[in-house]
From Swiss-Prot:
This is Follitropin subunit beta. Belongs to the glycoprotein hormones subunit beta family. Heterodimer. The active follitropin is a heterodimer composed of an alpha chain/CGA shared with other hormones and a unique beta chain/FSHB shown here. Residues 1-18 form the signal peptide. Together with the alpha chain CGA constitutes follitropin, the follicle-stimulating hormone, and provides its biological specificity to the hormone heterodimer. Binds FSHR, a G protein-coupled receptor, on target cells to activate downstream signaling pathways. Follitropin is involved in follicle development and spermatogenesis in reproductive organs. It holds the Pfam family Cys_knot. Glycans are attached at residues 25, 42.
Length: 129
């Protein structure tokens, strides 16, 4: 009985104290080819840990889906990138996460790689806040 109580208390402690998948503030760098520099924007995205496991014995009949902390709902915001050529479209639309969950990474809308370019990558040498 004590081991059941301990397991229950441990799970409660872990749920409260350990960071799970949640919204977090990040800064991303935005650039457009027609403009001569990048700007940094503050937004929200999902970060944290999701329970997952990798089976030792792989079963081809049962796919092994690793869960990742990803967005459940998004809204889009638009900023004007300064310094663009007169004929160029200076508006940049970016996603803002409003709700997160642990789920399969959607490769159509998310960079699911282990090592992407990162949110602060800029092709130009000039970055403005």
């Amino acid at each position: 009985m004590k081991s059941v109580q301990f397991c229950f208390l441990f799970c409660c402690w872990r749920a409260i104290c350990c960071r799970s998948c949640e919204l977090t503030n990040i800064t991303i760098t935005v650039e457009k080819e027609e403009c001569s520099f990048c700007i940094s924007i503050n937004t929200t995205w999902c970060a944290g840990y999701c329970y997952t496991r990798d089976l030792v014995y792989k079963d081809p009949a049962r796919p092994n889906i690793q869960k990742a902390c990803t967005f459940k709902e998004l809204v889009y915001e638009t900023v004007k990138v300064p310094g663009c050529a007169r004929h160029a479209d200076s508006l940049y639309t970016y996603p803002v996460a409003t709700e997160c969950h642990c789920g399969k990474c959607d490769r159509d809308s998310t960079d699911c790689t282990v090592r992407g370019l990162g949110p602060s990558y800029c092709s130009f040498s000039d970055i403005r806040e």
